[in-house]
Amino acid sequence: NYCNAGHMPPVITYPDRTCSFFDIQADLPLGILTDHSYPEYSYHFSPGSGILLYTDGVTEAENKERAFYTKERLLQIIHRNREQHPREFIKEIMKDIQSHVQAYEQSDDLTLFTLIYGEEWNLPRKK
C-alpha cells in the first residue's frame, strides 16, 4: 500500500525488463495542510519487478545552459542499466546526471532509492 505526498512518479521495472513511469495520482506535498487526508492505494509487485523512487532534484538537475535532466533522459538511462545490481544501477544514473550537469552547481537534492522485489543478488561481502 502507498500514498503520494507530492512525490515524483516512480519508475517501475517489470520482470520482462521493460520499464515505465508508474501512473500515480499526485497529491499535496506533506505538511501543506495540517488536516489533509491522503488516499491509500495498492500495488502488487511481481517477482523480479522493481521500483525507483527519486526526488524532483533528479529530473530538474540543470546544466550551464539551464536545461533540465528530464524524465525522458532518466527513463533512457534506467532502460540501458535495468540488468545491473541495484547499487550499480544507482551509480550509473548518478554518473549520467553528473555528465549532464558537469560542474554546474545544483540548488536541490539528488536522491534515488531502488529495490527489486523477490530477487537475490549474490555479491561478495565487503570486509
Where are the predicted features?
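Conserved subregion of the PPM/PP2C metallophosphatase catalytic domain
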Residues: 1-127
